[in-house]
Regions:
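Juxtamembrane intracellular "pre-TM" segments in multi-pass secondary transporters
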Residues: 21-60
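Intracellular juxtamembrane helix-capping segments at the cytosolic ends
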Residues: 165-179
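Helix-to-loop junctions at the C-terminal end of transmembrane segments
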Residues: 106-119, 210
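Cytoplasmic membrane-interface "Motif A"-like loop-to-helix N-cap segments
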Residues: 115-129
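C-terminal ends and interior cores of transmembrane alpha-helices
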Residues: 129-146
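Extracytoplasmic gate region of multi-pass secondary transporters
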Residues: 54-104, 168
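A late C-terminal transmembrane helix in Major Facilitator Superfamily
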Residues: 176-212, 222
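C-terminal membrane-cytosol helix-exit motif in multi-pass small-molecule transporters
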Residues: 6-32, 229-236
Length: 236
């Protein structure tokens, strides 16, 4: 297994080396208008260091916090389906494949939708609302499991996982746009730092919470964390 993972990582590194290149230099004969646009100095807001920018930090914290419910699903959905749902390998695999495929499709659709309508902030707030609602529904269904079919609980879990995974590209694009081209790398690095802090903390927080309560409380906590990000994606 670990050998296969090593080969996949090596393949990714090889493709990255092969496909990622610096963009070609601007041709000398480029239109004057294009050169003027390229040479136009950034606005005062975009020239500000992202580390000192409140709006940038709000988006960064929103991204980091909203990743926590996603990590909860990615790291503990299989445990939940096995321990709570008593599903076997085939059922768990089918649920996770459906979740990941749905998330992939929704990420692409979300990016195209917001590119066409220019509504990234509104879309992010809507994503927070839907994600928080879906995890609340999952918590309620889990708490009422004696009266809720297992298939419905699995479907809600898959739906919640898709909803909390669909916003990534939109949020990162909004962050890079807010920071400006000259500071996009810094801003994205800030976001990734917070994201990986959540990736570290979420799996550590869930086991003691689960031991002290139940799965419904775990999913409710995920809903509360998702909902807490709503004001961080407020309109400019």
């Amino acid at each position: 297994m670990f050998g296969a993972l090593m080969l996949l990582c090596a393949g990714s590194a090889a493709l990255t080396w092969r496909w990622l290149h610096e963009p070609p230099a601007e041709p000398a004969a480029a239109p004057v208008a294009t050169r003027r646009i390229a040479q136009r100095p950034p606005t005062a807001g975009h020239a500000r260091n992202p580390l000192a920018s409140g709006p940038v930090w709000r988006i960064v914290l929103g991204i980091g916090l909203l990743c926590a419910p996603q990590f909860a699903v990615l790291t503990f959905a299989t445990v939940f389906l096995h321990d709570f749902g008593r599903l076997g390998l085939a059922g768990i695999s089918a649920a996770m494949v459906a979740l990941q495929l749905g998330a992939m499709v929704m990420r692409v659709w979300s990016g195209r939708h917001t590119d066409r309508h220019g509504n990234r902030r509104a879309y992010l707030r809507g994503s927070v609302f839907v994600a928080a609602g879906s995890f609340t529904l999952l918590a309620a269904a889990t708490a009422g499991s004696p009266h809720v079919p297992l298939a419905a609980i699995v479907a809600i879990l898959v739906f919640a996982g898709i909803c909390v995974s669909a916003w990534h590209g939109v949020a990162y694009t909004e962050l890079a746009t807010l920071a400006g081209a000259n500071h996009a790398g810094t801003a994205l690095g800030m976001a990734n730092t917070i994201v990986y802090l959540g990736l570290f903390a979420t799996p550590l927080a869930i086991p003691p919470l689960l031991a002290a309560s139940s799965w419904s409380v775990v999913w409710l906590a995920a809903a509360l964390v998702a909902g807490a990000t709503y004001p961080l994606f407020a309109a400019k």
